[in-house]
C-alpha cells in the first residue's frame, strides 16, 4: 500500500546521505580531490563562494565547494551556516581600497592615467577555445613575466573626476553601518545596507538586473571608471589599545561605475557613481553590483524609479541566493495537506459552477 | 544529556537566543503582530522550517519533550530531519505522542488531539504577511497593519463570493487575532483554523527567511474572516479514515491505482494510531 | 572599598533558558505567578527574579535604565554587558526598585513598530495568586486574580492609560523575591 512508502523516513534519510557521499566521491579508482587543490585550482569558484557566503576564508570555502560537489550556491549556504555560529568579536575599520596592492586595474574612461592600466590575470583577451592541452596532465606553465612594480600611486578615477567637481560627492559619515545579518532589512534601506545586501547577493541575479538597466529597464549610461583587484589590509581598533592594528589581508575586487546625472533643482549636472565591492576576484559581480547600486539610487536622485532594478524591495528581498534557493526548493517538501484542501475546494467550486450552468 | 560537540546547547549562541527571546516576548504581548528579528542562517535551508527551528531552539530546555510534525505526520522526512537535529544539538527527549509533548513544532497542521495548558505549538511559517498576494511591498503592508486597514482582504474575499459563490481560500486562511491584527495562520488547512481560537496552549510562529516572529497567547480570540451571509466553513473530505474510521479528523487522499481508486487516511498519524490502538484494546478486553 | 563582584548565573545557558520560560509563561498567562529555581545571589537591592530576568534579556543590544545603584550597575555591566542609560525614555529594559518612572516617559513603540516598546521590570514586595486584582484579556480564560504589594498608589491609573495606547505601550514584569508575574500591555486590570 502506498501509505507504507512514506514510513521509515529516518532510514530513508540515512540511506540518502550515504548515497550522496558515494556520488560526491565519484569513481574511487581516481585520486580524491584535495581541499588545497580546490583552493588553488578552482580559485574563482572559491572566491564566489566566499563572496556569496559572506565569509572570507579560502580554506573553508574550498571545503564547502568540495562538500557541495561543486554546487556553488550549496557551498555558499554551507559557509553561511558555519559563519552564523561564530562569535562576533568586533568590526574592522573601513577598508582603504585606495591603498590596495593592485594586481589588476583598468579604466574604460581614460586611455592612460596615473598608475597606468594593469591588465593582470584576466580572461578578457583570451580566445574562448577549449584548450585540449589542459585535458592532459602536463607541466605547470612557465612563470608569467613580471614587470617592475610601478612606484606611482594609483589614485581612483572617481577621485580625479571629483577634483574637477564633476563627480557628485559622497556624503561622509562616521555612523556605524547597519548589519543585515543581525537586524532584518527595513525600508527604505540606506545605501550601506543596500551595498551589504548586494555584496552578499547572487551573481547571476545581479548580472541579469544590471543587464536590464542597460537595456532600458532603468535609465543607465554607465562607464567603467575603474576596476581594481588586489589585496587590502584589514585593521581593527582593539578597545584596550585605542589605535588601529593590522590583522591581515583580504583580496577584493572593486568597481566604480561612472554614470550621467541630469541634475536637479538643487544639484548641477554631474557624474554619479555606482559602487561594487566583492571578496576575491569577482569582476562580473562587482560590475553588476555597481550597476544595480546606481539603479537603486534613482529615487534619492529624483529620477524615475519604475524599473525592477530600481526597486529596493524587489532587488534586496530577492538577491540573496541562500534565501531564494531555500524557498524555491522547499516546494519539493510535502504539501499534501494544502493540496488536499485545494482539491476539496476545487471540487466544491466546480460543483457550484456546474449546478449554476445546469439551472 | 549528550549534545553535538562544538555547538552550544540547542545550536544557537546565547546572544542570538536572547535576541529571539526578546522578540518572542514582544510578540506575545502584541497578539498577531509580526515582530522582525535578526534571523540567522540555519544548517537547514530557508523555507524548510528555519523560523520554527529558531523559535524552538530559543525556548527549549532539558525538561522539555519535543514532537515534530510535517503534514500532521511524525514520520515525514522533514519532520524526522528536524527532530534528529534537536536530539543531536539539544539532547532533549522526543515523542510522537501529542499529549506527552511540551513543545510541538509543526508544518501545515494542528494536531487533532486538543492541546492543553503547559504546551507550546511552534508553527513553521513560509510567508508571515497575510496581505502579500494583494500588496507585495512590505513597507506598505506595515502601514496597513498600523492602521488596521484590511479592506484589501475583505474585497478579495468578496470577489471570491461574487465569482464562485464561496470563499476560494482553502489553506492559510486569514484570521483576525484578538480583534485587531490580521494574521496568516501559516499554510494549515482552513479545517484547522477553529482550533486556534481560544486554544489553551501558547502558539508561536517563526518565519526564518522573512525574519518575523508572531504569537497568539492562550485563550485568545482567533476569528477566520468571513461575512454574515457567507460564514466561514472549513472543508474536509466527506469520508472516513480507512485505518481508524474517524469522521472528524482531517484526511489525506491516497491514490491507490491509476483507475481512479483512492482511499482516505488521517493526516495526523499520532491521532490515528491512538484510535487504532484503542480499538485493539477494546477488542482484546 | 568596593565589594568583590557577585557571581552571575552558575550555568548561563540553562539558567537563562529556565528563567526565559518563566517569563514566557508569565507573559502568556498574565497574573499567573512563576517561581524561579536557582541560587543566583545578586547584589542588593536586586531581588532574585528581577536580577535573573535582566541577565536573561539584557545584552549589548539593550540599553538598560535602573535606579538600583552602583553595585547593581557594576554587576549588570559585567554579567550582561548592557549599556546603562540615564534617560528612562532611551531604555529598552528598565529595572525600578523604587518609584518607577512614569509610563508616558518610556518608549512605547509606534503604530508600525509597537514591538520597540520598553519592558519595565518592577521590584515589588509580594506577589500572590488567587486574590486581589481581577485580570482579563489575551492569555486568560476568564479571569486571573493577582495581589501585588509594593506598587505606587497611582499604578492602576497609569496602567489604564498605557493599555489605551494599544498596540503601543510598555509591558511590565513584576518581581518579588524569586517570584515573578507579567502584565502585557493588553491586560485589563480591575480592582476588587
List each language-model region with its residue ranges:
Chain B
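General detector of N-terminal leader/presequence modules that precede the first folded domain
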Residues: 1-182
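A boundary/linker detector
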Residues: 162, 181, 185-216
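Short Cys/His-rich Zn2+-coordinating modules
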Residues: 217-231, 249-251
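Short cysteine-rich clusters marking metal-coordination/redox-active sites
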Residues: 241-245, 266
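Short Cys/His-rich "knuckle" micro-motifs
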Residues: 248-254, 274-277
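Short linker/helix segments within small regulatory modules
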Residues: 253-263
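Short metal-binding segments enriched for Cys and/or His
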Residues: 267-283
Amino acid at each position: 500500500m502506498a501509505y507504507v512508502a512514506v514510513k521509515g523516513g529516518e532510514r530513508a534519510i540515512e540511506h540518502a546521505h550515504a548515497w550522496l557521499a558515494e556520488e560526491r566521491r565519484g569513481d574511487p579508482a581516481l585520486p580524491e580531490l584535495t581541499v588545497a587543490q580546490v583552493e588553488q585550482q578552482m580559485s574563482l569558484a572559491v572566491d564566489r563562494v566566499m563572496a556569496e557566503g559572506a565569509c572570507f576564508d579560502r580554506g573553508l570555502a574550498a571545503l564547502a565547494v568540495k562538500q557541495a560537489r561543486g554546487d556553488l550556491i550549496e557551498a555558499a549556504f554551507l559557509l553561511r551556516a558555519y559563519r552564523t555560529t561564530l562569535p562576533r568579536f568586533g568590526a574592522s575599520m573601513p577598508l582603504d581600497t585606495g591603498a590596495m596592492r593592485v594586481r589588476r586595474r583598468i579604466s574604460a574612461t581614460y586611455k592612460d592615467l596615473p598608475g597606468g592600466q594593469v591588465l593582470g590575470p584576466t580572461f578578457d583577451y583570451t580566445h574562448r577555445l577549449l584548450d585540449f592541452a589542459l585535458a592532459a596532465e602536463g607541466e605547470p606553465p612557465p612563470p608569467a613575466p613580471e614587470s617592475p612594480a610601478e612606484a606611482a600611486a594609483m589614485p581612483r578615477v572617481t577621485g580625479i573626476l571629483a577634483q574637477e567637481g564633476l563627480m557628485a560627492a559622497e556624503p561622509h559619515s562616521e555612523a556605524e553601518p547597519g548589519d543585515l545579518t543581525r537586524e532584518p532589512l527595513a525600508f527604505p534601506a540606506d545605501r550601506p545596507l543596500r551595498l551589504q545586501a548586494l555584496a552578499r547577493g547572487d551573481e547571476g541575479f545581479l548580472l541579469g538586473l544590471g543587464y536590464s538597466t542597460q537595456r532600458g529597464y532603468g535609465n543607465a549610461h554607465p562607464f567603467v571608471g575603474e576596476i581594481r583587484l588586489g589585496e587590502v589590509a584589514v585593521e581593527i581598533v582593539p578597545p584596550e589599545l585605542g589605535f588601529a592594528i593590522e590583522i591581515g589581508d583580504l583580496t577584493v575586487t572593486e568597481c566604480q561605475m561612472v554614470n550621467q546625472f541630469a541634475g536637479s533643482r538643487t544639484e548641477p549636472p554631474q557624474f554619479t557613481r555606482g559602487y561594487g565591492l566583492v571578496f576575491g576576484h569577482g569582476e562580473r559581480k562587482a560590475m553588476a553590483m555597481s550597476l544595480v547600486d546606481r539603479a537603486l539610487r534613482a529615487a534619492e536622485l529624483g529620477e524615475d524609479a519604475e524599473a525592477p532594478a530600481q526597486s529596493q524591495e524587489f532587488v534586496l528581498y530577492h538577491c540573496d541566493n541562500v534565501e531564494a534557493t531555500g524557498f524555491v526548493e522547499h516546494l519539493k517538501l510535502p504539501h499534501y495537506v494544502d493540496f488536499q484542501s485545494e482539491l476539496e475546494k476545487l471540487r466544491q467550486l466546480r460543483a457550484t459552477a456546474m449546478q449554476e450552468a445546469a439551472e | 544529556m549528550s549534545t553535538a560537540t562544538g555547538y552550544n546547547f540547542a545550536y544557537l549562541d546565547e546572544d542570538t537566543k536572547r535576541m529571539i527571546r526578546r522578540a518572542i516576548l514582544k510578540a506575545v504581548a502584541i497578539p498577531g503582530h509580526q515582530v522582525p528579528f535578526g534571523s540567522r542562517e540555519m544548517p537547514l535551508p530557508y523555507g524548510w522550517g528555519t523560523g520554527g527551528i529558531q523559535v524552538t531552539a530559543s525556548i527549549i530546555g532539558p525538561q522539555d519533550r519535543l514532537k515534530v510534525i510535517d503534514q500532521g505526520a511524525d514520520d515525514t522526512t522533514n519532520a524526522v530531519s528536524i527532530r534528529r537535529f534537536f536530539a543531536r544539538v539539544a539532547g532533549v527527549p522526543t515523542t510522537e505522542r501529542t499529549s506527552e509533548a511540551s513543545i510541538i513544532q509543526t508544518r501545515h497542521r494542528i494536531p487533532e488531539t486538543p492541546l492543553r495548558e503547559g504546551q507550546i505549538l511552534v508553527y513553521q511559517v513560509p510567508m508571515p504577511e497575510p496581505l502579500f498576494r494583494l500588496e507585495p511591498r512590505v513597507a506598505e503592508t506595515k502601514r496597513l497593519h498600523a492602521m488596521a486597514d484590511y479592506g484589501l482582504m475583505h474585497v478579495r474575499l468578496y470577489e471570491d463570493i461574487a465569482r464562485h459563490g464561496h470563499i476560494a481560500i482553502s489553506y492559510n486562511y486569514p484570521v483576525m487575532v484578538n480583534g485587531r491584527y490580521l494574521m496568516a495562520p501559516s499554510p494549515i488547512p482552513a479545517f484547522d483554523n477553529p482550533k486556534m481560537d481560544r486554544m489553551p496552549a501558547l502558539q508561536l510562529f517563526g518565519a526564518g527567511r522573512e525574519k518575523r516572529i508572531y504569537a497568539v497567547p492562550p485563550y485568545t480570540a482567533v476569528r477566520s474572516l468571513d461575512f454574515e451571509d457567507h460564514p466561514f466553513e472549513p472543508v474536509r473530505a466527506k469520508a472516513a479514515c480507512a485505518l481508524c474510521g474517524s469522521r472528524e479528523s482531517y484526511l489525506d487522499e491516497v491514490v491507490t491505482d491509476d483507475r481512479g481508486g483512492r482511499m482516505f487516511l488521517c493526516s495526523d498519524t499520532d491521532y490515528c494510531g491512538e484510535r487504532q490502538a484503542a480499538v485493539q484494546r477494546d477488542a482484546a478486553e | 572599598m568596593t565589594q568583590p563582584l557577585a557571581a552571575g548565573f552558575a550555568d548561563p545557558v540553562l539558567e537563562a533558558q529556565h528563567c526565559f520560560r518563566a517569563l514566557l509563561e508569565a507573559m502568556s498567562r498574565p497574573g499567573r505567578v512563576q517561581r524561579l529555581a536557582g541560587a543566583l545571589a545578586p547584589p542588593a537591592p536586586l531581588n532574585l527574579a528581577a536580577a535573573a530576568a535582566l541577565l536573561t534579556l539584557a545584552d549589548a543590544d539593550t540599553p538598560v535604565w535602573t535606579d538600583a545603584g552602583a553595585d547593581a550597575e557594576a554587576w549588570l555591566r559585567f554579567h550582561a554587558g548592557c549599556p546603562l542609560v540615564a534617560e528612562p525614555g532611551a531604555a529598552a529594559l528598565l529595572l525600578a526598585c523604587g518609584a518607577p518612572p512614569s509610563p508616558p516617559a518610556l518608549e512605547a513603540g509606534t503604530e508600525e513598530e509597537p514591538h520597540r516598546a520598553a519592558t519595565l521590570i518592577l521590584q515589588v514586595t509580594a506577589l500572590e495568586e488567587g486574590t486581589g486584582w481581577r485580570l482579563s484579556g489575551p492569555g486568560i480564560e476568564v479571569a486571573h486574580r493577582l495581589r501585588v504589594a509594593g506598587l505606587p498608589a497611582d499604578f492602576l491609573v497609569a496602567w489604564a492609560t498605557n493599555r489605551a495606547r494599544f498596540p503601543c505601550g510598555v509591558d511590565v514584569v513584576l518581581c518579588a523575591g524569586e517570584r515573578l508575574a507579567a502584565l502585557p500591555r493588553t491586560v485589563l486590570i480591575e480592582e476588587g
